[in-house]
Amino acid sequence: MILLLGIPSLIEVYFYMKKSVFAVLAVFLLAVLFVGGVSAEKVITGMDDLAGAKIGVQLGTTGDTYATTFEGDEAGTTISRYLKGADAVQALKTNKIDCVIIDNLPAESFVAKNPDLMILEEEFTVEEYAICIKKDSPLTAEINEALAKLKADGTLDQIMLNYIGDDAGTMPYVKKDVERPNGVLVMATNAEFPPYEYRDGDAIVGIDADIAQAICDELGYELKITDMAFDAIIVAVQTGKADVGIAGMSVTEDRLKNVDFSEPYTNAKQVIIVKNPEAAASPAPILGLLAGLGVAALALRRL
């Protein structure tokens, strides 16, 4: 067989095409690797879409209780429980879960800081918040009396308005200069639930902290706030490690088996946080694809 000088043989053409095919495949594989981690999400538009979803909640909260009713159903619904509401929100942002069920005011606080999230208009459930106290304690009657007075004189409304709405931050509750002959009142809370309780530097602040201070001002106690996991609060009250639990806690039949509750001091509702479909799409997948193509292009130069 005679080969013309400078003209590639069929074998050379074959191997060149084979290398080109592998190069193209490399482009796609590298692009996939760089874009990795982006997966299809279940679209949640209301309660009817929760079946089969990956739901995030804060451990031990009312949201946890209601979400548990979906757990283990035929649709394959799963519940991820987090010690902090912020951790559940972060899991939603990184596509580890499809939605978060949480109280409305903390939800509004989280969404305000994360415009890529939104709260569905459909309410999951409506509830009342109250203070948990050791069973059969005379403190229950004292706290109810103080709450009634604080409601009547507008103090409770002022505290709430200082954290929500257009007047937020303009009317803080100021600790009163009164005698405190009754010692220390220990309040157990979970400072991961803004605006009810959260940390501002070393201090624990929020709606519940202010309400507790107002109650102590009325009853002659010095207030001490102890931060702990939410699901440890009732045990702390039962065992006397804390006098009261104030942590955006709703009254439920299960909790009433272990502690007493004061009269409610506010109403709340559980809502569903999801990804905001109108938020600008993340550039991460595109950047990943470009990076993959760039690496593949460098590889092609070496062929």
Residue ranges and their predicted role:
Residues T62-T77, P115-E123, E145-N182:
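Ligand-binding clefts/hinges and TM-proximal coupling segments of bilobed small-molecule sensing domains
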Residues T78-Y82, Q90, N182-G248:
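Extracytoplasmic small-molecule ligand-binding "clamshell" domains
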Residues K42-K54, G169-I204:
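Immediate post-signal peptide segment of exported/extracytoplasmic ligand-binding proteins
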Residues L59-T62, E127-G169, D210-E218, V274-S282:
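Extended ligand-binding regions for polar small-molecule ligands
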Residues E41-D49, E108, N114-T125, I133, ...:
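Acidic, polar ligand-binding/catalytic clefts
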Residues E41-D116, D136-P138, S250, V271, ...:
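Pocket-lining segment of extracytoplasmic ligand-binding domains
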Residues P285-R301:
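A cross-kingdom C-terminal cell-surface attachment/processing module
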Residues A26-L33:
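Bacterial N-terminal signal peptides
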